[in-house]
Amino acid sequence: MKINNVDMQQAAAFANEVQKDKSKAIKVKKITGSWNFPEGNPQFSAVLAHASGTTTVEADAPPFLGGAGQKPDPVQYCLFGLAACFAQTFASVAAEKGVTLSKLSVSAENTVNLSAALGIGNEPPTELVKITVTASGAESSKLSEIEALARDRCPGVYCLTNPIQLQTELKVE
């Protein structure tokens, strides 16, 4: 049965599997992309694998940073990932609670200071990300409860609000 476009049978089966063996909750996510050198192409592209196949995603810097602005920039993709993750978590929590949503939209916004990226300052690139959720289908108090649970459970929110170790590796060919 689907609620809010969430397959509750699949989600419940996975939750039961994880309850029996917590290692089943661990999923590796990886993308590999390439910088595109020929003019006229977006600067970066990657093929993302998913359960139904693959999707090519392209990014391009805005003109003021030397790109052509042909595609969304990397920060927009970060915000998209956060908004999509939060929406998926919100819809799933609502479904768990038996709430059938009639509307759900999520906006993710930040202000970017590019001085450090340009090498002419050390100001933080961003100091705030704002998520705005517009939802209907239940009482305000129930939607607030769902929003709080989504904030607690969303992997994208966790990535922004907790220190995560970053490793970089350079391979010279």
Annotate the PLM regions.
Residues M1-F80, S92-E173:
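Extended beta-strand/beta-hairpin segments
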Residues L79, C85-A87:
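Compact, glycine-rich, soluble single-domain proteins
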